[in-house]
Amino acid sequence: ALALLFVCHIGFGQDLNSLFDEFKKEPNADCISISPFMMTIGKMFIGNDSDAKLARKFKSMRILDLEACSTSVKERFSKKINAQRIKGYETLVQVNDEGEKVRILAKSKNDVIRELLIVCTGNGDCTLVQLKGKVSKSKIAKLLAKEM
């Protein structure tokens, strides 16, 4: 019985790659991947303030934008992304403002965030942003406190 419970727990939650794979194939979906090399080039053009210093910590980015997709695709995405937790990620912030939901999730090891996930749904918006890098939780907390 314990083994069955363990297997069920592992299977619970949506795998992030399968979400990207499923929805990037939808008509009018935009999926953009920015490689570490391109991120390095982009970093040459950002300023030197505290936000820019934080942005330098991220090595790659992947964006899934479903704004131009059909209502049924957006609803299906919203249900999948909001109904269950995403494997390996913890929710840092969740905001529901006039029908628009924003969640910021993180995958971390010790006190370092390795991946940051931003999910926006509602009011016609369906966007998923994945940032990979190494950022301390305290730096993200400061940024979130400033923005909220």
What annotation goes with each model-predicted range?
Residues 16-77:
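Early exported N-terminus immediately downstream of N-terminal targeting peptides
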Residues 105-136:
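A short, solvent-exposed beta-edge/loop patch
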Residues 78, 82-108:
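Short Gly/Thr-rich strand-loop-strand
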Residues 141-148:
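A recognition module on extended beta-rich or small alphabeta surfaces enriched in W/G with H and D/E
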Residues 26-29, 56-58, 97-99, 113, ...:
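Extracytoplasmic
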Residues 1-19:
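Bacterial Sec-dependent N-terminal signal peptides
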Residues 72-85, 129-132:
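Surface-exposed flexible segments
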Residues 11, 97, 121-122:
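Mature, soluble, non-transmembrane domains
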